[in-house]
Every structure is written in C-alpha cells, then in structure tokens.
C-alpha cells in the first residue's frame, strides 16, 4: 500500500494528466473490488479488517507498477524523467479478471464450508464438511425394481414431488419441490444426495459418507432417484452418446476443463442429475413437514431407450441404516429434442382443447343462435346468411340447396358474415379459421364445387363426403380434390359438433333432405376418440420392422396401435395428427385392419382396453407382403460371400459373380425336369447331368451344409434378423434344424427384442416351438413392446374372430385351429416353465439338446412323439413341382425333410458315425423330378431310390458298392479335355444365350417382367452352381495325377536335402538347375547380350582389384 500511495503522489517532473488518469483507474478497480466483496454473501458477517486485507490483495493484483504489468495496458517508467508508454503487455485484462474470479470462488467455497460446519456440526474437527472431490467414485448398484414392490401407503413418510412438466429437453433444468410429511416429528435436518446423480465435482463431498461420525449420519435423510420407462417400468442407463454430449457441454467453460468427469466415469451413473451439493440443509423445517427444492436435469432422450410413453422418476427416502421410509413416483415426462416454441404451442393447444370441453351444448347453442334465429324469423329467404352464421366451418352442409343466383353471391359478403360471427362470440373459433381453406371467387362455380361438399371428419369415423344433391356427378371431383383438403380439414375441423344437430332441426322446413342426417350427427357424441385416416406406406413385409406413419386426428400419448391382432413394435405420438410406429411381424400375407387401443380412456368403464371402431366405409387397411424367401436368399448369399471374399457384400453382386463363374459349365446340364415325362430305364446313367431345381428351403439348406464349422451363419440384416429368425417365421423346420445343428444362436434378438421363438410363435408351428424349447431357449424374454413368446402365440392364434380369415388366407401354412392344438402348444410352455421334460417322448437320452451331438434317428423320433400334434402339422412346401410325384402324408414328409441330405456333404459333418444307420436313408423331398434306379441292392432291396445330381448316395450304399467299382474312364481322368464335350458345352451355352435373349426380347414392354426373369435366371444359375459341386470321392484327377506328382517331388526333395552329396540325385539336380539358369538367361538377354554383360562384369572386377592394390600400398 505504501508503494501504491507513493505512486499516487504527484512527483515533480511528472505529467499531471497521466497521474490523474492512473488515479482514476485505481479508483475504478477499487470500486469493482468493493462491489465483488460487498456483493458476496460470505463476507457480510466478516469484519472490516478482513475486507481491507482482501482489498489490499486485490489492489495489488490490479496495480503492479513496480513490475510494469498494469492491467490498464499502460505502464509508466522513469517517473520524474521522460515518461514512456509501453504497450507490450504479456497478460490481458480478461485473463487477470478470470484468475481473480477463480480465486474468489475457491475462497467462497472454503468460507462456505467453514460456515456450514460451524452451523450444522457439533464437532467441526471430526465432521468437517468440505466439498470438492477428485477421487474416483466407488458406488454400489441399487436395483430400483426392489422398491416398486413396496406399498407406499405402508411407509411412515408421505412424499410428494411437484414441478415436473410433461415435456422437456436435456438442456433444461427442472426445479422440483419435494414435500415430506410424517405423523411423528422428524429429527433430521439435512439431506444427502446419491453419488450417482451429482453433476459437478465441486458438489461432491470430499470424503466418503462412511468416514463421518454416526451422529452426523443420523441427522441425514438419504434421497435416491431412479429413472424408469413409463408403463413398462424398465430400468434406464445413460447411453454413451449422451455421456459424450455431457462432456462437451461441461467443457464449454473458458478453462476448457470438464468438471463432470466423476459422473461420466461412474459405472452406475444415473439418468437424473442434481445441481445441488451432496449435503445441504432443509429450507423449511417443521415438526412433521420438511420442504426443499432440487435442481434437476434428465440427460438422455426417451427415444434412446424406446420409451414411447416417457420417463417416470422414482424417489425414495431412507435413513442412515438404509431402511425405506417413503417413496414417490412422478408423472411421465417426455425428453425430446423439440424446440421450446413447439412445446409452448403444444401446451397452448392442450389448453384450448380443455377449454372447448368445458363448453356445454346449451351454452354453445345459446351463443350461436341468440341473434341468428331472430334474423331468420324476419326473413326466411336468406339461407346463405343463416348457413354461415350457424357455423362458419359447417357451411358446406347447405350450399347445394342454394339457387344458382345465390351461389354467385360475391365472396366478400360471406367473409363479412364470418367476421361478425367471430366478433359476437368470444370463443376460440378464430384459432382454426386461418387454417380453413378459403376458395377463390373463380372456384365458386359448378366446376369448383369443392367448397360445396361437406367433409365431416368425426373422431369416430373416417372422412365422409356428404353432398345433399348431385352426389354421383361430383364424386370424381371430390376424389380429385380430397388430397388437398385432408390436411386442412384435420386442422380446421368443426369445434362444435353438437350444434350441428341443432342447426338441422332448425332448418327442417327449408330442406327435407336434412332429416336423414339427424341420426348420423347424433351418433357423434364423443369428440375425443382418435381416428386413422391414412397409413403410409400401405403395405410391408410379413417379418415387419419397417416404419409406418399413421395420419389422423385426436392422437395422444399412451395409445397402442395394432395391425390385425399384433401389437406394434414401437409407437411414438408426434402430434395430434401423426403417429409413427413400427410394423409387427405377421404369420401370413394379406390385408389387416389397423386399430388404436386407448388403455387410459376416462370414458371406458370396463377394465379392458377400448379399441376404436372404424366405420366400414373407410377403414384403415394395411397389406402384408411375403418376401421372406428373398431375404433368406440374400442372407445366405452374404454368408457365401463372406466365406469367399472375407467381407460383406451386396447379395446381388455375389449372385452375379457366382453366375458369371458358373455360366461356361452350366451348359453341360441336360434337359430340365419339366421336359421329362417319366422315368426310363436309362435314366440312372444320365442322372449325373440332370438339371434339378430346388426350393428355397432346400437350396439354403444346401448352402449351410456346404459351409465349414467356423463359418458365421448368424449374420444379421439391418434389423438384426438372422437366418434362424426368418426360417422360424416361414415354418422351414428342416432349415431350422440344420441351422441349430450348425451352431446358430437361439437367443439372438433383433432390433425390437424379438427372438426366433417369437417368430415361431407368430407362425405357430408346434414342431419348431418344441425344437427351440428343447434347445434351452429363454422363453421368458420380452420384446421391446413387452410381449413374451407365449403372449405372441395367444395374440395370433386364440382370437376367434380372425381364425376363419387366417385359414382362408394362409396358403402355405395350413394349421387346424382347434382347442386341442392350442392347449397342447400352451402346455409346452407350461412344462418348460415348470422345469419338466416331455414325458410322452420316446427320447430317453438325458442330453436332449439339438445343439449337442446325438443321433439323427433319436432327434427324428423326438419330433414325432406327440400324435395329436402331428395331425396339425402343415403340408410340406419344399418342392417346386409337386405334380410330378405322389403326395405323401405330411408326417412322412416332415420326417423326410428333417433328415434330408445328411450324407451328400458328409465330409463337413462333425460326427461321421451318424450316417451309418440304414434306417436314416429316406427319400429326399427337395427334388422336383425323380428317376427310378434300375439296379437292385445286394441286400435284396427292390425299392427305387432317387439320387442327387452329383451321384452321391448314402455312406452305407457307398460301402456296399465300392467292391463293384470299375476302373476310371478317360473322361473321368481328364474332364477338361478338348473334344465333343467342348462342342456340347459351346452349343448348350449358345442355346442358353439365345434362350435368354429371346426371353429379353419378349419382355421388353414390361420392366417388371424383365426384373422377374432376371431373378429367375440368377436363381437357376445359383442352383446349378451348387448342383455341379464335385465331391472328393469323384475327383479322379486329384487322386491319380496331383497326389502322385506331389509325392514324387517331395521324395526327390528329401533325398536331395538329406542324402549323400556325391549321389546321382544331387548331380542331376545341379545339372538341371544350371541348364535352367543358362536357358533363362539366354531367353531374357540373348547370347550376345549375355557375353557383353559378363565382359563388363569382369572388367569391373579387375579395375576394383587394381584400386584396392593402390590403396593398400
């Protein structure tokens, strides 16, 4: 201070203006210091000496004349001499001010800790409360579901939380008011917040709560807050994306250091955070009532947790011994990223809607017709004026009865009538008036009859176009203009529907046709029911998963959407006119009705949910399309492409590559099965070259069996569906069996939480359901819409109203829907839920699991153990052309389908002993045409057996016929030789090209036909690719040429490497290598070039030697 006072003294020779300027800067800094110190609440109780000390310290920070770094960016050197102004300042004023503020914040925190300890703690030395923590939080996870089971009425404390809005954002801070009421006096005076919900490091206690004394902990009420999904009560955790956003949000400070790292690094961090200190005193304390406020934020969006109904916050109050004293669950809150303007508009609309409901029918009638009826009694020749004064939004109901000269009334007249009406009625009618479509003067003609049609949009019924006259003439015009008026009528729909019936009764003498509308208008008593007007898109796949938008009116949160009998996978209400939902899977293709279920309807007196009935004239219809086979083939192609190239590619590119590689050899196949009229004695010798077409199930099954054990068969599509999901939906039991045996995961879930068991219950195949249950599948898993597999089965197969429709539309899956079938399928779940096995099964092996190794016949017998279930099994759909073979019993076909083709790829099987059973050799149902075998087996069997295109038979038959095998033919040893085969291949290839060219020429007029033919061609080539695959047993070239050559070369190398160096083998090897080098050099360089190269090398060697001799000497 002395130095500063000397500086303020005007010295001789100094400029008085500069001295005065610096004195003014000192006074400004002093005033700023006084404001900061006196404005802070922590210094109000201190002495003036403490303030003077802080003033001196801050003054020294601001004024440093001896060091030449004044905060005023001016330093004075050589007082009394020539004054020099130095503008090269190292530290700006803003950084100096920021450091002072940080210093003061630390001092405030220390002072607050000191004052808090002196006021609230009896022993400051032991229970000193210090805030600000740097150590990692080690918290214990608490399951909030344990508290939901406790009845709040039986707890000693009554907790109430208020101030939570319906919609908020992650950036908005919520100020919650908590009130705790008790019958007995409460001794606690402070609150303790959980460590998992503290947002900033400076709010944490520096020590753990366990380090404090017992008396201090008894004086605390422990509050816990958990965020759950509304309705489903599913627990939530902050997603990684939102955690990173919170880190960026905290790092926006000038220092650039995030102060929420403790919360971010905490494993048990919660979705709700508090901007309060971890321990703070209660503001309002009474004997039996405690009140305080919490500053809260919810830091994750509802859509990240698929909480369509929002979040609820569960508050619990415990004591220091972790005994539950009270709990409270808040109302749902939606955390969205909508702007505040949108939320305010929504709130305003809700207020307007509630004000409309308070208006009774008598009041609306009185306000509307208090003046208009008097005018009507004076002059009844003014129907146009009466129509507009009755209701400006229902003016179309009587426009068609106006004479032509009245229709041509100038339009400003009608606007003035509406303006007078709105001025007389101080209602909310003007809110929807700007949204009403205002016709132009040119549209008020016979062609522009759009405004004359009354589009009555009721909440119970879809759009109805009501015209009192000339309906047939205007129907086409209404359909053409309906698209433009739909959205406008949604917003500007009639606000008073009860007054419409009153207007009809008042105008019965004017138009007798209005009598027929009375009954219709009286049915529209409830204006709060939602209705669906349009579904976008109107069709989708049966496996679901696509986004579907519903357009309508009176939508709200909490509604459930059903497609037929299936609940939507997810539902999000965006506004009163828009709902976005995700399509659920269905068991069959066809049209279903889209309905809305309101479980929270106040007018519903029953306990069951109320479904909104849609009028028959315009129902919301959605069409399911079956394209699951295409998706199955695409996934199979991706698996093959991953095996071939090691990367995921588009399925079409993989198919084209396979077809391109296989097309030269594809012409070797003979005629297709469609051209064969029947078996002949010579077909056995031609079956190797017979073109065989397979169904999708058998084709994919062959692909899976051709893969090795390490192949990834659980590749999923964009929705998380694997081959097992789609095979269960299509009732491909043989493919399901192959996938499970190859190691497919039975508990995989897709993006909506659906497992393969869910899809099996949708299709309803009892054999697949039993197969999955035997594989220890988790049958209690719930999808994201809260349904288990058993509930999905009940929803799809027990609704009696839809059984007949399902039986008519299900062409590929024919089940017998009866009580016995349903009870037996439900008994499967009950038995596995009770932990019991099938007692009536012939399977006695304890290791009853398909994913483990066990005999094929054992598994087949276990599938067919229940006789009643076999009667309800579907007919096999594995053959493309079933007319060429005799239809067998469904049970036999299932037996064949489950054991088919276990031996054609036996080299890839895990357990080769399974193929040694003669009883396992059964007919193969995937072949579209059959050939009879003319030779008899040595065991005396005279049955005809079909063979595959590659000529492979069972392992048992191969062993029997091995002794009768002849020597290999020349064509077998050299299958790629030039000759007649090459000409035959070229001819067949040209025929295929000509046939494909002719097909393209015939289908040039239709793009759809071209696309279908291209897919059919790719499918045939894909079949031939897997058909022409040659087994190791028939590869004669490998056995008789390559293997002996490899053995010869290997023997030569061993004798050369480890034999005697003077042997003839070494001498011959050296000669061969020398001649090969010489021949290669002559070929590359030529004789003259080689001589020149050697001469240059020799000359270089001589020169180098001479130089070396000179260097040495």
Swiss-Prot record:
Disulfide bonds: none annotated. Residues 91-114, 344-376, 437-462, 658-687 are annotated as: Disordered. It comes from the Eukaryota. GO terms for molecular function: lipid sensor activity. SMART domains: ANK (SM00248), IPT (SM00429). It is a single-pass membrane protein. InterPro entries: Ankyrin_rpt (IPR002110), Ankyrin_rpt-contain_sf (IPR036770), Dendritic_Spine_Reg/Scaffold (IPR050889), Ig-like_fold (IPR013783), Ig_E-set (IPR014756), IPT_dom (IPR002909). This is Protein MGA2. The gene is MGA2.
């Amino acid at each position: 201070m002395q130095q500063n006072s000397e500086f303020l003294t005007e010295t001789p020779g100094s400029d008085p203006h500069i001295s005065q300027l610096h004195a003014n800067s000192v006074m400004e800094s002093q005033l700023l210091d006084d404001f900061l110190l006196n404005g802070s609440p922590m210094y109000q109780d201190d002495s003036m000496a403490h303030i003077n000390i802080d003033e001196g310290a801050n003054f020294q920070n601001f004024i440093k004349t001896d060091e030449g770094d004044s905060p005023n960016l001016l330093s004075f050197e050589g007082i009394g001499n020539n004054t020099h102004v130095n503008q090269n300042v190292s530290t700006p004023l803003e950084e100096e001010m920021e450091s002072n503020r940080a210093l003061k914040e630390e001092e405030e925190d220390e002072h607050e800790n000191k004052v808090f300890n002196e006021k609230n703690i009896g022993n400051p030395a032991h229970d000193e409360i210090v805030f600000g923590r740097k150590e990692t939080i080690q918290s214990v996870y608490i399951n909030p579901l344990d508290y939901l089971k406790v009845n709040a009425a039986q707890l000693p404390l009554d907790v109430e939380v208020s101030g939570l809005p319906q919609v908020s954002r992650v950036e908005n801070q919520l100020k919650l008011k908590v009130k705790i009421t008790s019958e007995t006096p409460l001794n606690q005076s402070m609150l303790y917040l959980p460590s998992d919900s503290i947002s900033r490091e400076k709010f944490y206690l520096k020590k753990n709560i366990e380090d404090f004394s017992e008396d201090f902990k008894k004086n605390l009420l422990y509050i816990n807050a958990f965020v759950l999904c509304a309705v489903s009560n599913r627990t939530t955790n902050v997603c990684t994306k939102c955690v990173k956003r919170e880190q960026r949000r905290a790092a926006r400070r000038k220092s650039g250091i995030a102060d929420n790292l403790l919360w971010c690094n905490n494993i048990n961090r919660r979705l709700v955070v508090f901007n309060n200190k971890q321990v703070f005193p209660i503001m309002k304390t009474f004997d039996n009532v405690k009140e305080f406020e919490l500053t809260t934020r919810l830091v994750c969006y509802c859509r990240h947790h698929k909480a369509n109904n929002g979040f609820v916050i569960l508050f619990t109050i415990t004591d220091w011994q972790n005994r539950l004293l009270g709990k409270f669950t808040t109302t749902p809150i939606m955390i969205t990223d909508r702007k505040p303007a949108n939320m305010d508009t929504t709130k305003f609309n809700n207020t307007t809607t509630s004000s409309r409901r308070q208006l009774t029918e008598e009041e609306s009638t009185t306000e509307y017709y208090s003046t208009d009826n008097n005018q009507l009694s004076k002059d009844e020749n003014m129907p146009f004026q009466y129509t507009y004064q009755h209701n400006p939004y229902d003016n179309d109901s009587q426009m068609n009865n106006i004479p032509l000269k009245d229709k041509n009334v100038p339009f400003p007249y009608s606007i003035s009538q509406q303006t007078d009406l709105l001025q007389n009625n101080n209602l909310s009618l003007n809110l929807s008036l700007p949204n009403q479509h205002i016709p132009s003067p040119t549209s008020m003609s016979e062609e522009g009859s759009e405004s004359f049609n009354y589009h009555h949009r009721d909440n119970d019924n879809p759009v109805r176009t009501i015209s009192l006259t000339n309906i047939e003439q205007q129907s086409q015009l209404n359909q053409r203009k309906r698209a433009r008026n739909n959205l406008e009528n949604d917003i500007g729909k009639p606000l008073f529907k009860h007054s419409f019936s009153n207007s009809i009764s008042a105008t019965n003498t004017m138009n007798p046709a209005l009598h027929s509308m009375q009954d219709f208008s009286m049915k529209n008593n409830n204006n709060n029911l939602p209705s669906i007007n349009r579904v976008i898109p109107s069709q989708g796949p049966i496996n679901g998963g696509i986004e579907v938008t519903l357009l309508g009116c009176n939508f709200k949160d909490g509604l459930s959407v059903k497609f037929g009998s299936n609940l939507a996978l997810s539902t999000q209400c965006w506004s009163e006119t828009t709902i976005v939902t995700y399509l659920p899977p269905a068991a069959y293709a066809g049209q279903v009705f889209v309905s809305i279920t309101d479980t929270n309807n106040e007018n519903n007196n029953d306990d069951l949910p109320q479904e909104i009935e849609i009028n028959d004239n315009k129902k919301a219809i959605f069409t399911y399309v079956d394209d699951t086979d295409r998706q199955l083939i695409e996934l199979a192609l991706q698996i093959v492409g991953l095996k071939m190239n090691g990367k995921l590619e588009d399925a079409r590119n993989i198919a084209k590559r396979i077809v391109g590689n296989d097309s030269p050899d594809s012409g070797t196949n003979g005629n297709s099965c469609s051209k064969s009229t029947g078996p002949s004695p010579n077909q056995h010798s031609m079956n190797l070259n017979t073109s065989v077409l397979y169904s999708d199930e058998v084709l994919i099954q062959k692909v899976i069996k051709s893969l090795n054990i390490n192949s990834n068969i659980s590749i999923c599509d964009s929705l998380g569906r694997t081959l097992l999901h789609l095979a269960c939906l299509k009732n491909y039991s043989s493919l399901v069996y192959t996938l499970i045996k190859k190691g497919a995961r039975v508990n995989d879930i897709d993006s909506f939480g659906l497992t393969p068991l869910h899809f099996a219950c949708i299709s309803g195949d009892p054999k697949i359901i039993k197969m999955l249950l035997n594989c220890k599948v988790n049958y209690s898993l719930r999808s994201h819409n809260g349904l288990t597999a058993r509930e999905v089965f009940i929803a799809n197969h027990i609704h009696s109203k839809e059984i007949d429709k399902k039986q008519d539309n299900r062409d590929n899956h024919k089940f017998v829907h009866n009580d016995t079938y349903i009870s037996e399928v439900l008994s499967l779940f009950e038995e596995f839920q009770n932990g019991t096995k099938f007692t009536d099964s012939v399977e006695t092996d304890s290791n009853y699991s398909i994913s483990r190794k066990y005999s094929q016949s054992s598994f087949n017998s276990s599938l067919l153990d229940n006789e009643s279930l076999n009667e309800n099994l579907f007919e096999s759909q594995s053959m493309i052309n079933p007319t060429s073979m005799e239809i067998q019993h469904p049970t036999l076909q299932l037996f064949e389908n489950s054991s088919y083709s276990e031996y054609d790829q036996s080299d890839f099987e895990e357990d080769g002993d399974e193929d040694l059973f003669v009883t396992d050799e059964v007919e193969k149902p995937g072949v579209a045409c059959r050939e009879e075998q003319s030779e008899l087996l040595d065991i005396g069997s005279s049955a005809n057996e079909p063979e595959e295109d590659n000529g492979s038979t069972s392992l048992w038959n191969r062993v029997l016929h091995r002794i009768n095998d002849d020597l290999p033919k020349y064509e077998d040893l050299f299958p790629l030789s030039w000759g007649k085969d090459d000409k035959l291949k070229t001819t067949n290839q040209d025929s295929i090209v000509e046939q494909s060219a002719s097909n393209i020429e015939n289908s040039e007029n239709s793009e759809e036909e071209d696309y279908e033919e291209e897919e059919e061609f790719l499918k045939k080539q894909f079949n031939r690719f897997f058909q022409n695959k040659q087994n190791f047993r028939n590869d004669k070239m490998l056995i008789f040429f390559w293997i002996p050559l490899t053995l010869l070369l290997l023997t030569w190398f061993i004798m050369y490497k480890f034999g005697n160096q003077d042997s003839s083998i070494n001498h011959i090897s050296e000669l061969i290598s020398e001649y090969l080098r010489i021949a290669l050099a002559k070929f590359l360089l030529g004789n003259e070039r080689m001589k020149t190269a050697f001469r240059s090398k020799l000359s270089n060697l001589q020169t180098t030697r001479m130089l070396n001799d000179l260097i040495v000497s």
